[in-house]
Amino acid sequence: MRQLCLSTALLFLLVILVDSTPLNIYHIQDEGLETSHRRGPEKRSVIDVVSGIINGVATGTKIIEKGAGILTGLAEIITKAIKGQVMISRIQFDNHTLEELPTLQLEYSTLSEENNGLKTSHRRGLEKRSVTDVVTSIINGVATGTKIIEKGAGILTGLAEIITKAIKGQVMISGIQFDNHTLEEYQTLKIEYSTLSEENKASKPALCLEPKVTGDCNATMTRYFYNTQTGLCEQFVYTGCEGNGNNFENLEDCMKTCSQEAGSL
């Protein structure tokens, strides 16, 4: 759960999703969120976030019902704000959507005050973890301006519905304690996630799926490669020989070639 929260925080810290700890939500056909950072534009997949949340639920977490409602609200805002693929930002939100986002943030703040943290069971012992740690990083990412596809919003909605059905007040969520119908729905959600992940990979050019190769020479060149694990174009040092097609001179070329838009051309 700690890894999940760290991941989501990196994500926008939203997507938010954004550095070495994968938040595990997608690429390509749902390919990620485009966010502006001082160091330049980056890609982060909505799947990275969803995956992290799903993994946390699978492990078994205590989460409060109001937190599930906030996830649902976030998914609704995303769904309203986009048709196909549209940049979500304070500037580009429809007015009614823009008004709803501050409301969602206010609800989050209230929940943050009310919730002193959720108890989760780990091998190392009992510890406190607040569901709002996860929710706030997602909200912050949306507020910053993210690109996310409708199918990704649907997965968030499905996750929130599962949480809502599985808990009343505070209940431990786990494979053992799920009601049968909830457990079945959870498995369906995981299958949808896996399918979307595979579709996403298939839609990318083959060179984007090649591993990073630094080479064995003595030069020092800054290059970029598409990381299939994180869904990001990431910087690496190329030594000037060997290598493969997943080797771009600049971030923009990497994103254009291996982004979801490129895969759909």
Swiss-Prot record:
Gene3D superfamilies xrefs: Pancreatic trypsin inhibitor Kunitz domain
Entries under SUPFAM superfamilies matching the protein: BPTI-like
Organism: Ovis aries (Sheep)
Gene this protein is translated from: TKDP1
Main location as per UniProt: secreted
Compartments it resides in: Secreted
Molecular function, one GO term: serine-type endopeptidase inhibitor activity
Lineage of the species this protein comes from: Eukaryota, Metazoa, Chordata, Craniata, Vertebrata
Domain BPTI/Kunitz inhibitor: 208-258
Protein name as catalogued: Trophoblast Kunitz domain protein 1
CDD domains: Kunitz_TKDP-like
Keywords from the named record: Disulfide bond, Glycoprotein, Repeat, Secreted, Signal
Domain of life: Eukaryota
Site (Reactive bond homolog): 218-219
Signal sequence bounds: 1-20
Ranges: Sequence repeats: 32-115, 117-200
Disulfide bonds: 208-258, 217-241, 233-254
Pfam families, per the entry: Kunitz_BPTI
Start and end residues of each stretch annotated as 2 X 84 AA approximate repeats: 32-200
Gene Ontology cellular component terms for the protein in this record: extracellular space
Function noted in UniProt: May play a role in mediating maternal-conceptus interactions in the immediate preimplantation period. Does not seem to have proteinase inhibitory activity.
UniProt xrefs under PANTHER family: KUNITZ-TYPE PROTEASE INHIBITOR-RELATED (PTHR10083), SPLEEN TRYPSIN INHIBITOR I (PTHR10083:SF367)
Tissue note: Expressed only in the trophectoderm, which forms the outer epithelial layer of the trophoblast.
Glycosylation sites: 95, 180, 218
Keyword Disulfide bond in annotation: yes
